């Protein structure tokens, strides 16, 4: 029983709410892309477009989310462009991860964030493939619950100029002006 309790403690993730500058998140994603794309045979271009805003969230979980999106994209060895852009939407920042190299039907996009045994195949021994979007969905759910403002969401849609986009929203850090200052 003690071992089970210790294992549960190790598996628990504590949500550490902090204020994170959006440019820092995107720079970390770009650095990660450069590191993992070295071994990819196809020529994939990754570009970022940021905003001068900060979000409220867990920096480690958000790095993991962006790394999952990059890993999933690079799993498909097709040349082309991937973009990560941001925009302000009221009290949220919308992150748009666009893979312009491949198309997905509306039906495929609707199923991305749900378990699918055909997609979740065993890659290397003991490692599941195709679970990246499920992990991203859980991270955004955690942010919706613990980041201090409800309304975080994640979804996928066809991209305007071809390909498809996964977008997610995080609460903007709204600076509070102190009275008398």
Where are these regions (language model features)?
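Short conserved segment of the HATPase_c
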Residues: 104-118
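Conserved glycine-/histidine-rich ATP-lid loop and adjacent helix of the Bergerat-fold HATPase_c
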Residues: 135-151
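Conserved catalytic submotifs in the C-terminal HATPase_c
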Residues: 18, 43-53
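Conserved polar catalytic motif of the HATPase_c/GHKL fold
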Residues: 67-72
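Short beta-strand/loop element within the Bergerat-fold HATPase_c
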Residues: 81-91
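Short, small-residue-biased leader/transition segments that mark boundaries at the very start
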Residues: 1-5
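Conserved micro-motifs of the catalytic ATP-binding
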Residues: 10-15, 54-57
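A conserved beta-strand-to-alpha-helix junction within the catalytic ATP-binding
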Residues: 16-31
């Amino acid at each position: 029983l003690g071992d089970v309790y210790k294992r549960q403690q190790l598996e628990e993730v504590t949500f550490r709410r902090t204020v994170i500058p959006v440019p820092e998140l995107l720079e970390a994603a770009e650095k990660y892309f450069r590191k993992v794309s070295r071994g990819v045979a196809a020529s994939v271009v990754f570009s970022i477009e940021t905003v001068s805003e900060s979000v409220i969230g867990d920096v480690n979980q958000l790095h993991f989310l962006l790394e999952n999106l990059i890993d999933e994209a690079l799993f498909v060895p097709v040349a082309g462009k991937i973009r990560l852009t941001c925009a302000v939407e009221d009290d949220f920042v919308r992150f748009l991860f666009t893979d312009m190299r491949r198309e997905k039907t509306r039906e495929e996009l609707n199923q991305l964030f749900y378990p699918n045994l055909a997609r979740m195949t065993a890659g290397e021994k003991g490692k599941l493939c195709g679970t990246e979007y499920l992990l991203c969905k859980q991270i955004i759910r955690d942010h919706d619950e613990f980041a201090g403002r409800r309304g975080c969401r994640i979804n996928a849609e066809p991209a305007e100029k071809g390909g498809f986009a996964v977008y997610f929203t995080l609460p903007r850090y709204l600076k509070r002006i102190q009275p008398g200052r």
